Amino acid sequence: VVDIVDTFRNNIQGATK
């Protein structure tokens, strides 16, 4: 399970969006 990585990437994408 990669919840941290998923959330991290999602956070970056959302912030960069």
UniProtKB/Swiss-Prot annotation:
Keyword Cytoplasm: yes
Localization per record: Cytoplasm
Single GO cellular component term: cytoplasm
UniProt keyword terms in alphabetical order: Calcium, Cytoplasm
Family of this protein: Belongs to the TCTP family.
Function: Involved in calcium binding and microtubule stabilization.
UniProt protein name: Translationally-controlled tumor protein homolog 2
Organism, as annotated: Pseudotsuga menziesii
Species lineage: Eukaryota, Viridiplantae, Streptophyta, Embryophyta, Tracheophyta
